[in-house]
Every structure is written in C-alpha cells, then in structure tokens.
Amino acid sequence: MLSFLSACNSDNVSNQTEGSENTPAISGTALQRGCASEEIRQAALKNSSELRQKYSEIEARTERFENDMKLGKVLSDGTVEIPVVVNVLYRTTSENVSDARIAEQIAVLNADYAGTNTDVSKIPSEFQGVKAGDVKVRFRLANVVRKSTTKTSWSTNDAMKKASTGGIDATSPSNYLNIWTVGNMGQILGYATFPESSGLWNDGVVIASPYFGKTGASSPFNLGRTATHEVGHYLNLRHIWGDANCGNDLVADTPTQTTSNAGKPSYPLYNTCSGVQRSVMFMNYMDYVDDAAMFMFSAGQKTRMQSVVASSGARSGLRIN
C-alpha cells in the first residue's frame, strides 16, 4: 500500500545495520511516503480463515509458476490488458481529478509496467541484470465514476468503497481493477488489497488525490508512482524490505535490506543483514522513496505479478474484458 504508513527509510550517510534503530533517515524531503497495505492485509488475514486459505493457495501457485518458468514450461501468451475503473470521490474542485489527469496516471502505469519509463536508464549497472523490463501487463481505462461528498477526511476502513457509507461501490471487482481517489487520508498516500481479496466488495486500490497522476499532484509524490506502488501490491508484491527488520519480500533477486528508504538516497546505499553488507535496491517501486527516486521492478517481482494474472492465477478474471 502506498500511503506508506509505516514509512521509514535509510540514507547512505549512515548505513543501516540489522537491529539498528528503524527511525527513517530522511534524504531530501520532510514529507515521507505512507502505505498501509501490509498492515491492513495482516489484520484481514488474522480475522478470516478463508482469506488465510486463499493466501496460502496463491503463494503455492506462485511458487509452482516460478518453478515452471525456470524449467521452460511457461510459454509467453502475450500481454495481459487490465481494464481500470477510476472512482473519484471529491469535496473540492482540486479533489475532482480531471479526465486528463486520469489519462496521465494510466499512461504512467503503462510506462512503468512496460519498462519504458523515461528514467529507466538510471538503473545502476549492478541491477541491470535483474531488471524486469516489460512486465507484460497493460492498463486500459474502462470507465470513470464521480461522486460529490461532504467528507473532509478518509481512513483505511474502506468507507470509500461502499455507497452505503458515502463511497462508490466497486464495478465487478473480479473483472476490473477499481481505483478510488479520495481527498485527505492524513499520512497515507494510498493502499491496496492483495490477490487473496480478488472479487471481494473492497478489492482494489485507494489513492489520495494529491498523489494521483502528475499535473497538479503534490511533490515529491507527483510522478504517478503511488499508483505504480499500490498496483504492485494488488498484483501480489510485498514491500521490498519485507515489512520487518531484514525481512523477506519473497523475491530472490531483491537484496535484503534493513528497513524502508525515503527521500532521494544516493547510490550506492549499503545495509547489513545477517552479517552481510549489500547494496540495496532503493530505486525499486516497492520501497518508500520519492517518486523521482523509484524507477524499476525486478525480474523476480515480474514473475510474481505474472503468476496472478495468468490463466490459472488469482486475478485471471481481469483477462476477460
């Protein structure tokens, strides 16, 4: 999730070591990304045995898909195009994001997931060998739904996703990626549901309107990367630090790091976990750095995302529209 609620980071002035203080070391800005996706996920898993079962099945299916890829059993079946419904909840003119800004956000998603973003050339040479390139996922705007509201703030309780609580009901969540834009969410930039929630009434992505799209968005999160990050969660990516000190994001080619990074770190940035010092991939879309400092997915992340939109994947329903 991108509100980056548990926003934390490290910079290269004071390199991070396992077990060190996790207070973010801010580089370049006082405003930090906040994403609550993983916190919300863990709460949902704790309260639902059905979701826990789906989660386990998805992870097992992902592992099989990864092994089949390694064995050459998975052939390219072309790019998957995901239809998107943008649900705009607004109180003020600035919160009523324009059609042009929505188109701009869809364009950012398409560039970032195709690996054609203009800043892809900034990927350091040490990570060139594991960059995702084209994830083979595209996004097509299917509809925009707008609704005026008197609410001055929103939280992560999913009220924006139900008409009965002042929001907008999702459009066929099994078959469409629903994105809700809302006004103020405090320190949260956005959040998303993971594939085990596929088809549920609350399935989709939420983004605070100041961080949606580019034109008129708030710096340093004004390049549309909040959506890139949150859609990554929607497609089964975890935060790159595994939401724990030297945690596991279930991706083999992303270096283990002590915690999240924020601001605009200078490369190289080193962390030490289990006594091993590594240069970390802070420019990954699943970290917490500023929009201008993130510009890549890894090949391992690509495989995880492809597994959920495959014909046997948890989000295969997105393929039929």
Please give the residue ranges for each predicted region.
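Propeptide-to-catalytic entry region of secreted or membrane-anchored zinc metalloproteases
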Residues: 17-173, 310, 314-315, 321
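Soluble periplasmic/extracytoplasmic beta-strand elements of cell-envelope proteins
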Residues: 83-87, 178-180, 206, 285
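Metzincin-family zinc-dependent endopeptidase catalytic domain
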Residues: 103-269
